[in-house]
Amino acid sequence: MKFVDEAVIRVEAGDGGSGCVSFRREKYIPDGGPDGGDGGDGGSVYLEADENFNTLIEYRFERFHMAERGENGRGRDCTGHSGKDLILKVPVGTRAIDHDTEEVLGDLTTHGQKLLVAKGGFHGLGNTRFKSSTNRAPRQKTLGTPGEVRSLKLELLLLADVGLLGMPNAGKSTFIRAVSRATPKVADYPFTTLVPNLGVVNPRPGQSYVIADIPGLIEGAAEGAGLGIRFLKHLERCRILLHIIDIEPIDGTDPVDSARAIVGELEKYSPKLASKPRWLVFNKADLLLEDELKEKAERVVKELGWEGEVYTISAYGRDGTKELAAKLWDFIQSLPPEDKDANPEDEVEFKWDNYHQANIDAINEDYDDDFDDDFDDDDYDVEVIYQR
């Protein structure tokens, strides 16, 4: 199935049902009074993370999603049915963003997690609610409020512990094949990898973590060169980045310039991502003699002013890959646990929360101000004819 990691959809929660104006009409019961019921609440729209989904392609072609409207109230104090909630299944790792305000509504990072993205309208009140000592036959009701409408931008961010960075043909896909059972396409031309790939690494029995390989970056990617930087977002949740450097490029380019270009594009995209722990990994060590390899690696480290971890491997020959995979596991385990700030029932702010109380208070205030002793002449009263 085609990998789609972005989609824009429109969600509409259901409107609340309106209240009913009705009076009790029953034999032998004079002056039955009001019996209009309330309407039902409108259905809300939720996103739910499902591990059985791995792409947003369904929402690329189906963009409009509406929850059910609440039913209107009826006589005999019958309340209308509430509208059914609409639950949209999305892959684990999906982020919901308000397309108009760019507000991040939430991240769905665990299976079964739900996020409320559009709240259904509040139900209207029937005339029974407005009965009082000064208004015995009310003909007032309130309408249901509109459901919330949002344009959502859905972004799928891969959940991985380790992310791979590097120029095209640096050997990232070969490395992920060497340390996991993933089988991304490998060839001797640039941009072989067109979509992100995930692999599960098992460095020792009972140990595992996930590694993500994204398409290669080139200088100017922030301006749209190559495949751009749109896939860098998949590294945002990684706990450590591996910067794969081709120590002996076939086109004769300087590894120092290539490394600086990658760091520059990373900083342009996100300073936060650029500040993540990052290790330098010199690949294709099998193409050079040991002394020449050491000399080149030391020159790159010196010119970059690099003070972090440095490793030399041959992904093709799998030299040093097993040791690197084990050290990555040890490093990940040494990090503090990630903050779990996502609330499975996270709700968005809704403007109608105090709607009913405000309406009732306002109407009762009007009656208290205008009430006089002559009930029949009250401005708010109505003529009611009861039949026996």
From Swiss-Prot:
What the record says about family reads:
Belongs to the TRAFAC class OBG-HflX-like GTPase superfamily. OBG GTPase family.
In the UniProt record, the gene name given for this protein reads obg
SUPFAM superfamilies assigned? Obg GTP-binding protein N-terminal domain, P-loop containing nucleoside triphosphate hydrolases
Q: Which residue windows are transmembrane per the record? A: none
Q: What class of enzyme is it?
A: hydrolase
Q: State what protein this is by name.
A: GTPase Obg
What's the cofactor? Mg(2+)
Q: Which residues form the OBG-type G domain?
A: 160-333
User: So where does GTP get bound?
Assistant: 166-173, 191-195, 213-216, 283-286, 314-316
- Places the protein is found: Cytoplasm
Which positions fall inside the Obg domain? 1-159
Q: What is its EC number?
A: 3.6.5.-
Keywords of the record: Cytoplasm, GTP-binding, Hydrolase, Magnesium, Metal-binding, Nucleotide-binding
Q: Which Pfam families match?
A: GTP1_OBG, MMR_HSR1
The protein's superkingdom reads: Bacteria
Keyword Lyase belongs to the record: no
The species this protein was found in: Shewanella oneidensis (strain ATCC 700550 / JCM 31522 / CIP 106686 / LMG 19005 / NCIMB 14063 / MR-1)
Drop me one GO molecular function for this one. Answer: GTP binding
**Which Gene3D superfamilies would you find in this protein's record?**
GTP1/OBG domain, P-loop containing nucleotide triphosphate hydrolases
| Primary role | An essential GTPase which binds GTP, GDP and possibly (p)ppGpp with moderate affinity, with high nucleotide exchange rates and a fairly low GTP hydrolysis rate. Plays a role in control of the cell cycle, stress response, ribosome biogenesis and in those bacteria that undergo differentiation, in morphogenesis control.
